[in-house]
Amino acid sequence: MDELKNIIRDIPDFPKKGIIFKDITTLLADAASYQRMVDLLSHRYIGKKIDKVVGVEARGFIIGAALAYKLGAGIVLVRKPGKLPSETFKKSYELEYGTDTLEIHTDAIEKGERVLIADDLLATGGTMAAVVDMVSSMGAELVECCFMAELEFLNGKNKLPADKVFSLLKF
C-alpha cells in the first residue's frame, strides 16, 4: 500500500491556510496505480452480490463507476442539488459552518438491493453519513462504505456504522 500512498501528493495550504490537501489526481493519472487501487477495492467485494454502487459527487464517481463495472453492478449518482433531471430524494446535513444538501433519484435503488457506497476520501464523515441515511431510507441493504483513502485523525468513521467502513489507504 505504501507505493499507492506515496503517489498521492500533499498540497500545503489548500484550500485554505493550515490544511494539507491530499491530491489523489496523481494516483488517478498513473494507469498502473489506478488499476491497482480499483483491483484492490473490487477484490474485497467479489462474491458479495452487490446490486448497486453509489458514487458520491464528484470524485466518488471515478471510484464508484470503476467498482460497479468490475462487480457487474449498476452505478447510482449522489449529486448536489439541481444536477439530476428526474424526481429526487433530498438530504440536508450539517457542515462545520452551515448546511449542505445532496440528492439521489427516487427510483435509483429498489428496496432490498445490496448497496456499496464509494467515495475517494473519508474526512469528517458528514457527507457519507448523509448518503448512508439516504440509501437506508430507500430500503437498501448497506454492504459497506468504501474509500480510497481516509484521514484517520479526523475520526470520520465515528459518524458511520462501525462495521460498515473500509478504507484502502490511511493517513
UniProtKB/Swiss-Prot annotation:
Protein name per Swiss-Prot or TrEMBL: Adenine phosphoribosyltransferase
Compartment(s) where it occurs, according to its Swiss-Prot or TrEMBL record: Cytoplasm
Organism the protein comes from: Geotalea uraniireducens (strain Rf4) (Geobacter uraniireducens)
Function text: Catalyzes a salvage reaction resulting in the formation of AMP, that is energically less costly than de novo synthesis.
Keyword Lipoprotein: no
Reactions catalysed, as given in the entry: AMP + diphosphate = 5-phospho-alpha-D-ribose 1-diphosphate + adenine
Pfam families in UniProt: Pribosyltran
Top enzyme category: transferase
Keyword annotations: Cytoplasm, Glycosyltransferase, Purine salvage, Transferase
